[in-house]
Design a protein with these regions (language model features):
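Short beta->alpha junction loops
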Residues: 41-44, 153-160
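Short, glycine-/small-residue-rich phosphate/pyrophosphate-handling segment
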Residues: 1, 116-155, 163
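N-terminal beta1-alpha1-beta2 submodule of the flavodoxin-like/Rossmannoid cofactor-binding fold
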Residues: 1-111, 149, 165-171, 175, ...
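Short histidine/acidic/glycine/proline-rich micro-motifs that form metal-
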Residues: 14-17, 90-92, 126-129, 156-159
Length: 270
């Protein structure tokens, strides 16, 4: 398949040719003329877990900046690809810990659709057909990114030729959808998620998620009026005060405590 000059990127946590996933990846590579770029999460992935500190909320800059290269990898390679292929193995009813870390750390981009307009294919080894929850998580993630799930290839068939046919068909669909710029209609997963984050980023979460607010405004995400005057006035004050570095540092130091403050009465130990 000729991708027509489009950038194709495969992200995986397993490249061993001794595994089903490794063999599916090898087959996918042969489907594209000129080869495809690959990111091996075991070698190039993030080196630490998300700290939940929300330092990224102000300007999409992770607290790990300077400690690993994940932020640059995500921006320069993942976000600049036209076609993404995510490859993983079902592990304990989810994907591997490396994939979990990848998804968690990519939150430095906040709630915005960082993969907007991309064609995404999934190569999954393991009983995905028996794990509706995992499938829905992956589908929701892609819809929330305003990307298009071109298809899923698994090793569920016992006949290797059938698996090869799935992989070949997925490669063809990825290129065909990219050529036509096709993005499928959003289901409840994507539509409700978009509305939820639209409301929250406009209202209660406008501070501290200043970067999200700017991006939502630029993309036309705030597509209805709101009258949450208390939240709007509070956020206006905090946005103004946070323009001063000493106050911003003070707020960042209290961020974690403030996030759990509404739940303290439920978290008290005897």
């Amino acid at each position: 398949v000729d991708p027509g000059g489009r950038r194709v990127l495969l992200i995986t946590d397993e490249l061993s040719p001794a595994t089903n996933l490794g063999r599916m990846i090898q087959r996918m590579r042969t489907c594209f003329s000129g080869g495809i770029e690959t990111i091996d999460l075991s070698a190039e992935g993030p080196q630490g877990d998300c700290q939940g500190c929300l330092r990224c909320a102000d300007a999409n800059i992770c607290v790990y900046q300077g400690h690993d290269a994940f932020m640059e990898l995500f921006r320069d390679r993942v976000m600049k690809a036209d076609i993404l292929i995510l490859a993983g193995t079902v592990t304990d009813r989810y994907l591997s810990a490396r994939w979990k870390r990848f998804f968690d750390r990519s939150f430095f981009m906040g709630h915005v659709p960082a993969l907007r307009g991309k064609q995404i294919g999934l190569l999954i080894s393991g009983p995905l057909t028996q794990n509706a929850n995992l499938r829905q998580i992956l589908e929701a993630y892609i819809e929330m990114q305003q990307a298009h799930l071109a298809g899923i290839a698994t090793d569920a068939p016992t006949f290797s030729g059938a698996i090869d046919d799935q992989v070949d068909a997925l490669a063809q669909r990825l290129v065909a959808c990219a050529e036509h710029g096709f993005i499928g209609s959003s289901t409840f997963l994507g539509h409700s998620g978009r509305i939820l984050f639209r409301d929250e980023i406009w209202g209660r979460l406008r501070f501290p998620f200043r970067a999200d607010c700017r991006t939502f405004r630029r993309l036309g995400g705030f597509d209805f009026p709101q009258r949450h005057w208390r939240s709007r006035l509070t956020n206006a004050l905090l946005l103004f005060l946070s323009s001063f570095a000493p106050f911003r540092r003070h707020l960042q130091g209290r961020m974690t405590d403030e996030m759990i403050r509404p739940f303290r009465r439920y978290l008290k130990t005897r």
